[in-house]
Amino acid sequence: MPVRAIKVIISMIGLDSHTTGAEVVATLLRDAGFEVVYLGTNQTPAMIVNAAIEEDADVIGVSLHASNFALVEDLMSLIEEHELTDVPVVCGGNIPPKQIEQLLARGVARVFPPGSSGDAIVEYFAGQARRT
């Protein structure tokens, strides 16, 4: 039986229009053999969760800035509500250290700040997939 590619949702939550980081991560993951569903900008928590359900995603990647912190809280609540806690959420972006701690405490699997290595990102996503 063939093994399917790890499927990843990549999104920017809220009104964040800084696409470079998310696009770089999407490209890194595609080049590494992942199946990437790129949702783009202006995504709500509900849109991200719906995409994860529809696409049967293994991992959710969210790009955000500190001002969108509350939306990640909403995202994590929806993930719990839809019983998707086996789908890891990985965040990246320009996030203050205190908010990184809060995101991790809320259930975000990992936060990658600017300057994180591409190899580390790919390796982490590969290790977090719930099924391959």
Set out the residue ranges of the language-model regions.
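Cofactor-cradling patches in redox/metallo enzymes
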Residues: A22-A32, V36-E123
